[in-house]
Structure formats: C-alpha cells, structure tokens
C-alpha cells in the first residue's frame, strides 16, 4: 500500500503486542521513529504555530465586609446606661413614696395626739364647771390709742370744734374735750391735721393753720406745727387751697391738743376735707 508523502506530521506506527518479532521478545513495544527520512527535492513541512497565550487569571473575589464590633459595643453600652438611669429613677420614686408615707403617718399621729389633748382639756374644764371652780378671767386686750375727728359746720370760735359722734369719727383710748384731744398715756404719737380753705372771690388774705398744745406745766400754749399761705390765688376769682400738717411727738399724760386757723369764715368743714387726729406708735 502506498503512503502519501505530503502528510504534514510524522507517521506513527503501532505494534501489536500479540505478534511475534524476531528482534524482540513478545510483549515488547518498539519505539516509533521521530522522523521519516526526507527524499531529495522534498521540503520540510513548517513547524506548527505556537499555542495561543493563556488568558490572565481572573481577579480574586472581594472579601466580605467585616462586622463592626464597636457599634455593637456602643449599642450595648447605651442600652446598659438607659437601664441604669431607669433603675435610679425607679429608686428615687420609691424613696419619695416612702418619705411621703412616713410624713403622712407622722401627721396622722400628731393629729391624733392633738385631738386627744383637746378632748382631755375639754373634759377637765367641764369637770371644773361642774365642781364649781371658777375659770380664770380672760386677758384684757390693750386698747389702741387712736383718734380721728372731722370738721363741724357750727364751729364759730377758736380753737376749732370737731365732730366726735357722727360720721367717720374714731375715738379709742383718747378723750375729746372742748375742741381738744386729751392724752391719758405717755408715749410717741403721730399727730395730723388738714384744713380746706375756699372762697368765692380772692383777696389774698394771709392764711395760717397751726396745731398747739396746752399743759399745766407750761405757762402758755406751745405751737407744735404751723402752716402759712401768701399770694395763693388770683385776685377777684374763685379759689380753694388745702393745708396739711403731720409729725411725731413725745406726748405726756394730761396734754391737750388743739387746732387754730386765721380765717374761720374761709374753712370748708366737710368731713373728707377738714379733720384732726392722732394715733400712738
């Protein structure tokens, strides 16, 4: 059989191991020739092309994200802190409740003791009344020394006379006698007086208003306060002016206080406009 000589690769021969060979024992494999002798005029076949380069290996897959232990620790820490705060709040509430219960119990106990002592005193007083023992007299309250007198329209002479019975007058611990206030206890007193002057036509007469004191220890009247007015209105026109006096004095028993004015006809005796008074400090 004729073999083709234009085959690009060397021929391979297989040896049957079952056939006997005069050059080798049975079961021996003979080597295959690496090349076939070239005949004259025959070209050597070109070498096979090199194998293509292998592709680069794929990049390794990305690593999975690691857990964040600080966040877990922070969450655990905040949870523990919240629990601790809640515990302290509950503890404070329980302590406050306990203190409130203790105070309530203490108040109830004091109230019971007070009721018991009151009932005992009431029982003792009722027994004394039944036996006939007189109860102690009530303590006398000291009267406040005070006086407030208002103007009296029928006053026609000096010193001024005052209303001591009707209206907004007040007398306590002080006597009123013939236009004057009589002091019956030594001490510091605030003395005051107000006089309201008015007229239909102004003639600018000098006006005076004074408070004076009389006492058997002094040979003459002692002026305590005095007020004067000059050029107080426009000539020929209607006018009105007030004069107020007030000060603190050390008065003794049996002192008599009076009020005097220069023009009695110009005085308005309304109780809210003209008055005289004092009170002990």
UniProtKB/Swiss-Prot annotation:
Keywords: Apoptosis, Cell membrane, Cytokine, Cytoplasmic vesicle, Disulfide bond, Glycoprotein, Lysosome, Membrane, Nucleus, Repressor, Secreted, Signal-anchor, Transcription, Transcription regulation, Transmembrane, Transmembrane helix, Ubl conjugation. One of its GO terms (molecular function) is death receptor binding. One of its GO terms (biological process) is positive regulation of epidermal growth factor receptor signaling pathway. It is a single-pass type II membrane protein. Its main location: membrane. GO terms for cellular component: caveola; cytoplasmic vesicle lumen; external side of plasma membrane; extracellular exosome; extracellular region; extracellular space; lysosomal lumen; nucleus. Residues 103-281 are extracellular. Residues 145-281 form the THD domain. Residues 20-71, 118-142 are annotated as: Disordered. The record marks 81-82, 129-130 as: Cleavage. The keyword Secreted applies. It comes from the Eukaryota. The soluble form derives from the membrane form by proteolytic processing. The membrane-bound form undergoes two successive intramembrane proteolytic cleavages. The first one is processed by ADAM10 producing an N-terminal fragment, which lacks the receptor-binding extracellular domain. This ADAM10-processed FasL (FasL APL) remnant form is still membrane anchored and further processed by SPPL2A that liberates the FasL intracellular domain (FasL ICD). FasL shedding by ADAM10 is a prerequisite for subsequent intramembrane cleavage by SPPL2A in T-cells. Residues 118-128 have a biased composition (Polar residues). Belongs to the tumor necrosis factor family. It is linked to Autoimmune lymphoproliferative syndrome 1B: A disorder of apoptosis that manifests in early childhood and results in the accumulation of autoreactive lymphocytes. It is characterized by non-malignant lymphadenopathy with hepatosplenomegaly, and autoimmune hemolytic anemia, thrombocytopenia and neutropenia. Homotrimer. Interacts with ARHGAP9, BAIAP2L1, BTK, CACNB3, CACNB4, CRK, DLG2, DNMBP, DOCK4, EPS8L3, FGR, FYB1, FYN, HCK, ITK, ITSN2, KALRN, LYN, MACC1, MIA, MPP4, MYO15A, NCF1, NCK1, NCK2, NCKIPSD, OSTF1, PIK3R1, PSTPIP1, RIMBP3C, SAMSN1, SH3GL3, SH3PXD2B, SH3PXD2A, SH3RF2, SKAP2, SNX33, SNX9, SORBS3, SPTA1, SRC, SRGAP1, SRGAP2, SRGAP3, TEC, TJP3 and YES1. This is Tumor necrosis factor ligand superfamily member 6. The lineage of its organism: Eukaryota, Metazoa, Chordata, Craniata, Vertebrata.
